[in-house]
Amino acid sequence: MKKSRPLSVMALLALSAAVCQAQSEERVDTLATSVVTAYHSGGTLSRGQDLRTEIINSAGLMKMACCNLAESFENSAAVTVGYADAATGARQIRLLGLSGIYTQMLDESRPILHGLSAPFGLSYIPGPWLESIQIAKGSPSVVSGPDSMTGQINVEHRKPTDEIPFFFNASRMSDSRLDVNVASSLALSPSLYTITLGHAEANFKDHDMNMDGFLDEPRARQFNVQSRWLYYIPEVQVRWGVGAVSDNRRGGQMGGGWQTDIKNRQLNAYLKVGRPLREDQSASVAWVADYTHDRLDGAYGRGLYTGRQHSVFTNLIYRNQFSEAHDLTTGVSLSWDRYDESLSRGLTLNDVLSGPAPVQRSELLHGGPYGEYTFHVHHKFNLVAGLRGEWYRGTGFRLVPRITLKFEPAESLILRANAGRGLREALPLIDHLGVLSTGKYFDGDYLSHQLEDAWTWGGNATWYFAGETNYLSLDFFSTRFADQLIVDYEQNPVTIAFYPLEGKSYSNSWQADLHAEPFERFTMDLTARYTDAKSTFRGAGLREIPLSPNLKGVLALQYKTRLSRWIFDFTAALNGSARVYDFMKDLRGDDGQLLYPGGRTPVYPQLFAQVTRRFKGFDLYVGGENLTNFRQEKVILGFDQISNPEQFLPQHFDASAVWGPIMGLKINAGIRVTIWKTY
């Protein structure tokens, strides 16, 4: 009981804040006022965006009892989410068949989750904090930087001017996970607004459903808080905020032996200032500044990894709308990162006796000017052409061109095309933190920062029928790498090799989406995606990227009764097969049969369901995840070679070869409390 006290205190503070909020509004009769809201189906393709953009709104984020940002993609076909390893609980995503490191993450158009915050950062953005998530495929605007290769994921938080001055959410999972979220907004004056966001979660029990002696999920405790502010007058708008994260997670063998102990601390502060230069708002200037500090300490058995990061990002933007048809945005941005890293693998007695590993410092600096021209003819045709001149310390100058076309030949048809270049500096260990959950030796320069270079192009056609709410969408996108860091598990069974790309590397992705409302209050989303992703591996040639599923299909159904008093959500997902590592081909299950005939994972289904009952001011919900109870067998490889807790880790030990669910069936229940503004 003592372990749950911090969460209980947070819940008490949340309810106290609700009372204070209600008193501060000075309403005459709050209970007599009814607020009618529209609960949308939860996700849709944006008609107005130039890029092919999927929007998951607040209703979509409520379809599951989760959730953080990673879990919100569980029922999405565009984004695949999985585990980086079976020990730390780190989540990773894939877009267009490629790792999430090639997808730029934004918080209200401000770059986030790069560097040390990336491996666990998807769990640091609670779903109840968000208004929506926008998933854009292809090459986005040059204004946000050169880093995007496969697309952008932008999150919109609840605003200081929110119509919901208080929101509280608490949920409990059958695996003992407790999750509490609070959002409280307040108008301090007609010009000054603020919102406070709080989150706490913890796992209190050990689970080993596959009986391999390892925790299926780490015991974790996370606290997360943000304070966001807005000052607004006609002459200027200022937004600023601060946030902090504390995350502790322990995994590995139960009762001792090989264990992981991860401690992550993060501080962030940002400032956004915007000023109109004309009364009609046709010209404006804005400045964005962001600072992040991360501290990551990880113990992997006897191995130790420590990382410290200081990051600064600044962007000066000028926009001028010359006429209704012509718009020009120019500016200059700068990004600076300093990393202090040390790594001691602890795989041999010599590693242990040599003492702490030396700290290696690296400073990454890049930036430059950019310009973006927009030409549009009403809603019929849009052209966006952008160019960045990016300078990288140690590498030199690069041009980053991008172009987007949107054409609406008829009211019911929208065509889009997009192409552009993306650049990013690789962070070998941070980008692939799962390599630390192995006993394999590292071969190559795993602390260098190679400049990765890729070109992405593609298009989308969306046909609307039987009104604005029904559509069929088809899209294709292709990414080609000119330079890439390859992390190769298969060159040698007991080593992981890091080396530059020595041939082709590409991903082709096809996707079809059908959204329909067959009858009132019933919506259906059917999505299918096929991916062909291959890379050249040293000594093996061009091969399919391992552990990356080639197919995913999702069917999402929702039905609401009148006045949305009852909401029923059901999602079925079919996950295609993936190529396994060569050293996994001969693995056998408990029945003696090969686990991966033909060297591929099985096709498996997953089911999710939730029932929500809405009352005045609060909702109750109960649901289930992974109702098929499908789990990956033999998640931890080589652990049977560990005869006692004192022996060193075998070289064949690998906890990073994860392609499917680790946890089985989960049941959840929760409550949402909402206080609306009344006038």
Model-derived segments and spans:
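Membrane-embedded beta-barrel scaffold of Gram-negative outer-membrane proteins
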Residues: S284-G298, E408, I414-R416, S448-Y506
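Short acidic/polar hinge/loop motifs at secondary-structure boundaries
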Residues: Q92, R110-K137, V225
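Flexible loop and strand-edge segments within Gram-negative outer membrane beta-barrel domains
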Residues: N203-N224, L230-S282, Y291-Q309
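Gram-negative outer-membrane beta-barrel transporters
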Residues: H376-K380, F476-R480, P500-K585, R672-Y679
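A beta-strand signature from Gram-negative outer-membrane beta-barrel systems
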Residues: Y124-P165
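C-terminal beta-signal and adjacent terminal beta-strands/loops
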Residues: L574-R588, T612-Y679
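N-terminal periplasmic "start-of-domain" segments of outer-membrane beta-barrel proteins
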Residues: V28, T33-M64, Q92, G100, ...
